[in-house]
Amino acid sequence: MEELVLPVISRQFDKKLLGRYEYVIELAKPEQDEWTNHDVTQIPGRRMFDVAQQGIRDAMHLKPLENDGEVLPRILDMSIACYDMRKTMMKKEGVDFVSNTRWLEWIIQDSMDVQPLRVHINEDHSTVQYDMFSAKVHIDSRKADTTSYHAIAVETKAERKCCHVRTEVWNSVVRNHLFNTAQESCYTFKQTYELIVNSERLSTEEEFRVGAPQFHTIQRNHRMQLGDNAYDKFLKGLVQLRVSGTTPAKIRDEVAALDVIRDNWIRGSFDRSHIKSLELCRLLSSIGRKMVNMEEEPKDEKDLSVKFQFRLDEKFSPNDPERNVIFTSKTHRTNEDRFYVLLVIAASDTNNGRVWWSNPYPCLRGALIAAECKLGDVYHTLRSKYAWGVRPTYKPKDLEREREKYVVGRVNLFDLEGEPATKVIHWEYELISPTYSVSNHKGNQCDLYPDDVEITTKFNEDRYREMIQSVIDDGWDQKNLKMYKILEEEGNPLLYDLEKDINLDSQSQVVFPSYYNKWTHAPMFNARVKPCDIELAERKNDDPFVKRTLKPIKADCVDLLRYHMSHYYDLRPCVKGVSLSIKQTPSGIHQALVQDDSYSRLLRRRDVDLDYSSPCPIITNYFLLEKFHILILTIMEKHYWELDDSDDVYEFPKIDASAFEVDGTLYDISQTIVHMYDRFFEKRRVLRSIDESRWILHLIRISQGRERLEVIERFFPNYGKAMRQRDFKKVRDVMFLNFLPFFFLTGDNISYEHRQWSIPIILYADKLRILPIEVGAHYNRFGVTCILELLNFFPSYEKREEKLEEDIVLCADAIVNFYLQTTISNGGVQTSIVSTKALLYEMYLSSICGGYSEGVLWYLPITHPVKCLVALEVSDALVGADVRIDKIKRRFPLSAKHLKGIVQISVHPNRTFSVTTCGIVKHKVCKKTLLKHRCDVILLQTPGYVFGNDELLTKLLNI
């Protein structure tokens, strides 16, 4: 068969007459007014695809459930490419072909453009109906296995020009944590507390009188706030406070639900059957998220939640040995309070220690917060009223802190409700040196002993030697080696925690830590931090880019990678608004990036026609990709063992737009990582493709031991040779080790296996030091943020030729062994969440730029004289047919030669249509009359080519 017929009908046409046609295009009602855009907010109510109407940042983490199944738009490209990779293999039956199914399985799993479809299935005619605003497409179910939507965000051409050729980069950049904005860590008096002035004195020499409170300038029962007169006197030790609980408005519903459970438990004579531990966990997790971080990255709380539920059942059991102590009748004890007492004890036992607001698990910190609403300072109340003290098995410091009251809690500035001029406590965080003046000859060794600073972070040499000896004896212990353990306790910013370090002593007087309002310099991290009071400058804003305080962290998305101590700030993807909107304004980050001095220079590196002043999100993402690429290569060039000996002084790591040019165009982080090894060790300028780069990193990550080394040697022979030889004599011989973490830390489709492990990095300082750098979801230590700033230090030309100390030689071998075995990147991902966001980003981009253009795309197989494909698309006319045809071709980056023809049908606002064909396909539009109905038909012809059978695509997809 060389001819195909596509009827094009109106809504009035009786579709029963067309039941035997394999494809039918049903036009929608003509538009009344001038047609400029579709109302995409109607999508959730139509049978199109599963994109819900909600906040855009929430939508990024949503698992699509309201759909009829998923389709992968590039599945044919992948399957055909795999078919082309076939190799002959001799079997008993003779010669057979074997496909690279391992590669095919990977590339399908690695795809980020899966579409969750919501279609209508017509059982009478065995057709699948794909809904659009401009038309409906009815496709025979035998032909519908590769049908997908082809959504396009229309480019703006007016005051600024967009470039939407590769819109998928935005999704990838966000998931690689390269599109984040930061707000510094912030603390306030706990919103679950009322801090009531109990007494006032005129000087610290005067004693507070027990039972005889005095009030000189402050009213009795005044509720103290940050920044008021009582607070000023509080800082001077002139007021005594009483702490009582209160319920913040944002968690009032959850606490009310807990109270219902509590009251049923009391009325039911404390029967454990009234305690639904799963429901309690759900409510407490909600409280923990709302009070600390509304948009916290989802954590796998399953195992901990089960443990917590077990502890809850245990504590509420009538046979629990502590129950009699808690239920002993005494003054100030109530059954209502006992419920929350048991909640906190269960949470503490689950945590094997005191629970704080900073606890990484929402359900545990939610238990503490809920109890604070009722009990005030929970652990003080437990000890003073319920004779319960922290257990000896808890951390030693938990015992020391038992008698104090802790009145500040960490809050997230993205979520904090607060008016301008409201006082908070925050951390100022600055790089000590944004750039260094260096030369190749002198290098850039870390100065661990800076002059004229208030507090300096120092290594504890005894603990450091113990760590090195343990590595020599037992190898690299990724779970127990920690950076904070090898630093002196005094001036250790990895141990600072204002929630624990600001307290009320036994006399209810405030105690601040010695580091408060002082700069702590941590030279190994090129960082200095200071906690101090600050005023809010802005109200809460849906745009995360709006800085809330007068002294915020000043860093763009790429510069943030240099802020190593990431527990001193919070992160959010820099997007605002909703998932579905006809028109909305983007985050202010795009305009801010355009103002960067290097914006136009970096964009000129790309071999495409761009508006170098456009704030289009795709163009700003191109800028971030280029900046990331240059920053990584600029830093890592100094860790390659070969270096020109020069006294020329330059700023490092300054971004040079002319540096590290490549043959090819950058679209993915993985290309930069792979190119780093190619560039320095293999002397290649060619940038590998996205699929090849991701495949290389995947193979390295899934292999272990000797197999991993063989994979590295296959793709990077010179680098692999250094790993295999392990000839550690001079400093230059171990410099390749700092490249190893990059194999495992980055990716938009990976998740870490752990919450907090450590990896080895060499620091070049007064001597070579091996440091345990922590990586994981805890404290936002994602991607290269955990290592990058330490890599700014590199050895001088002469240092490279120095003989290695014996301990470094022995540890280097252990480091190689660790990186050959580590499974850091094997945490697994929620594929249904990660892979289904392409349509979401396209819809969101359309609301920021020029609107949404729709289309439905499917394929027909050709069997003779060659096996190939013809693509057919029905779309609106908001985007030109030439643009759509180009986009269709881009769906076949691996097997473009097999796409021999394209049919593009554009539906206009008045419901006329135009047809464009290219390749082997020709067309003709005719009129058809059937009884009293009349319609158009599109006759498609492929002279000399024969359409294939129904199951040819099925066979191809099962090679």
From Swiss-Prot:
Q: Which UniProt keywords apply?
A: Capsid protein, Clathrin-mediated endocytosis of virus by host, Host-virus interaction, Inner capsid protein, Viral attachment to host cell, Viral penetration into host cytoplasm, Virion, Virus endocytosis by host, Virus entry into host cell
Point out the signal peptide segment. none
Family classification:
Belongs to the orbivirus VP2 family.
- Say which species the protein is native to: Bluetongue virus 3 (isolate South Africa vaccine)
Which InterPro entries did the record assign?
A: Capsid_VP2_Orbivir
- Localization: Virion
Q: Which GO terms describe its biological process?
A: clathrin-dependent endocytosis of virus by host cell; virion attachment to host cell
What does this chain do?
A: The VP2 protein is one of the two proteins (with VP5) which constitute the virus particle outer capsid. It is the major target of the host immunogenic response. Responsible for viral attachment to target host cell, probably by binding to sialic acid. This attachment induces virion internalization predominantly through clathrin-dependent endocytosis.
Q: Does the keyword Endoplasmic reticulum apply?
A: no
Q: Which GO terms describe its cellular component?
A: viral inner capsid
Q: What is its main location?
A: virion
Instruction: Report the protein name in the record.
Output: Outer capsid protein VP2
Listed GO molecular functions?
structural molecule activity
